[in-house]
């Protein structure tokens, strides 16, 4: 375990993803915990993680999480489904600070949401092949789970393409098997996918509930920080700080980040990884 001085309540929350997808989680955390400071690292030089071998994903995740811990973050949020599947168990053994992931919160929400017990899961190849979602759903034997990999979605989001006929056609092809199975709840098992929720909803139909882990993950962050007396005190630190960083091209990352988060992204720093 990496031992560091115990961070105080005024320390930042560290969040990372392979790219911009984790901004969906960061945005929800910032909205729900407005007094918390955040360091966000998008590993765009090495992402997307989905097609990579699990060992390589774990290597990248360790490098970034180690950095966030070394920089004094009081909590690590793995805002990437593929990295959560590859790294969560190791992370909780490796770090003394709490680690939050995005898979269990989505499963919890889906189990509560489904009406007919038929749930679909879409994600990267790495996430789907890991069986992480399927394993967690097995604790609810009344739920029938169908999982489909949608490998091209991440590339579209990373290029800033979140609507249009081309991506809709691809979505319809990916999602047709889930429609045929009659799922009434669809887990967006990649933090990039909420940025395609309009297209995905159109392809699935309004009768299908889309589940994003962002809201539930933010609830976990709030609960754990409260339990460990690590919530930032607005009287002591009324102005939170936000640092957005990319291991790839910071300008491209900044353009996409501002599109999704707005002016809160004043600049994006180059992270040398």
From Swiss-Prot:
PROSITE patterns: ASP_GLU_RACEMASE_1 (PS00923), ASP_GLU_RACEMASE_2 (PS00924)
Isomerase as UniProt keyword: yes
Any GO molecular function: glutamate racemase activity
Record has Ubl conjugation as a keyword: no
Catalysed reaction, written as an equation: L-glutamate = D-glutamate
Binding annotation for substrate: 17-18, 49-50, 81-82, 191-192
Active site: 80 (proton donor/acceptor), 190 (proton donor/acceptor)
Disulfide bonding pattern of the chain: none
Entry keywords, A to Z: Cell shape, Cell wall biogenesis/degradation, Isomerase, Peptidoglycan synthesis
HAMAP family reported for this sequence: Glu_racemase
Purpose of the protein: Provides the (R)-glutamate required for cell wall biosynthesis.
Family: Belongs to the aspartate/glutamate racemases family.
UniProt-recorded name of the protein: Glutamate racemase
Organism field: Corynebacterium glutamicum (strain ATCC 13032 / DSM 20300 / JCM 1318 / BCRC 11384 / CCUG 27702 / LMG 3730 / NBRC 12168 / NCIMB 10025 / NRRL B-2784 / 534)
């Amino acid at each position: 375990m990496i031992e560091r001085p115990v961070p105080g309540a005024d320390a930042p929350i560290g969040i990372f993803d392979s790219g911009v997808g984790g901004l969906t989680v960061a945005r929800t955390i910032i909205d729900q915990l407005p007094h918390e400071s955040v360091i966000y690292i998008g590993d765009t030089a090495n992402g997307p993680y989905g097609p990579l071998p699990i060992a390589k994903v774990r290597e990248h995740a360790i490098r970034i999480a180690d950095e966030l811990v070394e920089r004094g973050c009081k909590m690590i949020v793995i805002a990437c489904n593929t990295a959560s599947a590859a790294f969560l168990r190791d992370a909780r053994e490796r770090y003394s600070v709490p680690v939050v992931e995005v898979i269990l919160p989505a499963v919890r929400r889906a189990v509560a949401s489904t009406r007919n017990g038929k749930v679909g899961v879409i994600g990267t190849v790495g996430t789907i092949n890991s069986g992480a979602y399927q394993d967690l759903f097995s604790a609810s034997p009344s739920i029938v789970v169908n999982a489909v990999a949608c490998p091209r979605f991440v590339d579209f989001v990373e290029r800033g393409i979140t609507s249009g006929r081309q991506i809709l056609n691809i979505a319809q092809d990916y999602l047709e098997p889930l429609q045929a199975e009659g799922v009434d709840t669809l887990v967006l098992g990649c933090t990039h996918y909420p940025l395609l929720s309009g297209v995905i909803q159109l392809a699935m139909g309004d009768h299908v509930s889309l589940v994003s882990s962002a809201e539930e993950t933010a609830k976990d962050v709030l609960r754990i920080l409260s339990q460990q007396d690590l919530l930032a005190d607005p009287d002591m630190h009324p102005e939170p700080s936000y640092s957005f960083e990319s291991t790839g091209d910071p300008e491209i990352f900044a353009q996409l980040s501002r599109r999704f988060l707005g002016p809160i992204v004043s600049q994006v720093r180059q992270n040398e990884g």
